[in-house]
Amino acid sequence: MPSLSILALAAMFTAAGIAHFIWPAMFARIVPPYLPAPMALVYISGAFEIAGGIGVLFPQVRFWAGWGLILLLLAVFPANIHMALNPEAFSRIPGWSLWARLPLQFVLIAWVYVAACRP
């Protein structure tokens, strides 16, 4: 039986990935303008979130799924920076929380590493 930490990671990433397919336009808004094909990036990142979320449930692939999620968290970090630097484009979200997401990303990376990647 997977640990509570693994189950929480799986639920969080799988739900976030599914959300990319339910509300793709919302996620496309946070893609920095210098990146091409925002909708494609939303669908690709959503698929990887789902794959990683499910993958951490299986001990045989947990290590690789964890590293995939860490790489994904690093890959989407520019979107978090874009949001923090352009709060006027995200007026429904408190500005302080846009900045709080930046260090939170590293907390998530540490969580994934400890739960799924550590030997």
Predicted region positions:
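Membrane-interface extramembranous regions
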Residues: M1-P119
